[in-house]
Amino acid sequence: MKITRRQALLGLAGASSVGGLGAHELLDWTATDGPLSDAGMNGLLTVADIVHPAAPEDAERTISAYVGRLNDRRVRGLVTTLSELDSRSRRHYGASFGALSRAQGERLLARIGANRVQSRPEGTLAERVRYHLVNSVLYALLTRPAGTEPLGIGNPVGFPGGFASYTGEL
């Protein structure tokens, strides 16, 4: 069977439109349903409050949308790490990690050593906290549509207008 150019172009156009719809789903910043429970989301919001004190009002929606786009392996790692951190929190403070204050959460993360280790997905609890929780929350918050503008670095050096905005010459 021979395919004509027209049939090939129609097939290519159909495949591209399906691929484009899939890419649109992956980049949907408004998705709010996610695989985490309320306790899990509270844990991630506590991490957000610790590592990014100027977290925006839409932090919960942004983090939920980010977690909803993760693959199953990453979500399992995130949930397992949150569960272990939660049990550690209950042992030290008698409350879940999501219920801790910012100061208590900081102390707990420092106690397990999350502020002194490299991130590894399969390492110690501190390395996994750094990889699955801290890095994921920072990535979600800093790559949202508003980006880094709330931090005063909206146009980094190397991008058009970057040097002028970086040096305050605008």
Regions found by a protein language model. Give the residues of each.
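Short, exposed beta-strand "edge-strand" segments with a Pro/Gly-rich flavor and a Y/T-containing core
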Residues: 1-2, 33-35, 93-100
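C-terminal segment of N-terminal export signals and the immediately downstream linker at the start
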Residues: 3-7, 12, 16-55
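Residue-level signal for well-ordered alpha-helical segments
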Residues: 28, 40, 55-58, 62, ...
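Mature-region segments of soluble proteins
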Residues: 46, 61-170
